[in-house]
A protein has these predicted regions:
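Histidine-acidic metal/acid-base catalytic patches
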Residues: 2-24, 29-53, 60-76, 199-306
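Conserved beta-strand positions in the central sheet of alpha/beta enzyme cores
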Residues: 81, 115-117, 153, 248, ...
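Active-site acidic/histidine proton-transfer and metal-coordination neighborhood
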Residues: 8, 13-19, 44-46, 66-69, ...
Length: 306
């Protein structure tokens, strides 16, 4: 096991022990599937309405589709967001025959192909660049429809220095409205990732989505440190709550992010989609890593209460 893997497993175990030590936690409940190698404490848990999924960025960036499906089935990850440029090869250049093949492979498995993760962004001061990204988003919506996906993830990626922030927020919102029309026409959704220097601040995402004002455009919660204010994400969550259609999570051992509060807030809005694990580093033991992650997710999500 490499050093990154060792650190993750140690921190994960310690985080689990710390949770057990919290006052008011009752013992009992079912054992966690495929997690016998991890000393996760049993607790009074209930099944959340949402599911655990995987973003191929970056844990699965070097996996083909068969490997993605196999590893997710083995470890209980129920959905996938395929990030562009990765080995799976699912891109807008895919032929009609290849699209049908990808769709069938997921349909024949226990893993849902939920969304496509793009790098489409709309903040450039160059109108031609913005239009090119809008057109590319339209093509991603067509691919998502052909593959049976729910959504296409797009992102803001910071503020250009030469333009006022308000003008950029307006521009992004207007571009999202155009993308929303394409998503509606293809029976999918646009998910704006809470992303980018400055643009990731929840009030700025709120502004973009307010300007877009489109029923086919929502937010992808991204579990950023900038969500947290005074140890809580409630204020940020309330700002974006009406738009949350997807959710990225990352290292559940991180103590500087209130994971249980996030799960509780998701339960409170009856979120019934996917929390996608977005892991920044590949692992030399991916199945073991995913088993540990699933165990921590089960414990954290199951113990949360609305």
């Amino acid at each position: 096991m490499n050093q990154t893997g060792r650190r993750f497993f140690l921190k994960a175990w310690l985080a689990s022990v710390a949770e057990l030590a919290r006052p008011g936690l009752e013992e009992g409940g079912d054992s966690l599937a495929r997690a016998s190698t991890l000393a996760v404490p049993q607790a009074s848990v209930s099944t959340p309405s949402f599911k655990l999924g995987l973003v191929t960025y970056n844990l699965a960036r070097d996996w083909d589709i068969d490997t993605i499906i196999k590893n997710c089935e083995l470890t209980g990850f129920e959905g996938v967001e395929l990030r562009t440029t990765h080995k799976h090869g699912v891109e807008i250049s895919l032929s009609k025959e290849r699209r049908a093949d990808v769709r069938k492979r997921f349909a024949d498995s226990r893993v849902r192909l939920v969304s496509l993760g793009t790098t489409c962004e709309y903040e450039s001061p160059d109108a031609a660049v913005v239009e090119k990204n809008i057109e590319e988003t339209r093509r991603w919506c067509g691919l998502a429809q052909d593959l049976g996906c729910m959504g296409v993830k797009v992102r803001p990626n910071g503020f250009p220095a030469s333009v006022s922030q308000e003008k950029t927020l307006q521009q992004i919102g207007q571009a999202l409205a155009k993308c929303g029309d394409a998503a509606r026409d293809h029976g999918v959704e646009i998910w704006l990732e809470v992303h980018g220097p400055g643009t990731q601040l929840p009030p700025n995402i709120h502004r973009m989505l307010t300007v877009a004002d489109h029923p086919s455009v929502g937010a992808c919660w991204n579990s950023n440190p900038t969500d947290v204010e005074g140890g809580s994400i409630r204020k940020s969550f309330e700002l974006l709550k009406p738009w949350i259609r997807s959710c990225h999570i990352n290292d559940l051992y991180r103590k500087n992010y209130p994971w249980r509060e996030l799960m509780t807030l998701l339960r409170a809005i009856n979120f019934n989609r996917y929390t996608f694990a977005e892991i920044s580093e590949p692992s030399c033991e991916p199945i073991r890593f995913m088993d540990y992650y699933r165990a921590l997710w089960d414990y954290t999500a199951g113990e949360a209460r609305p």
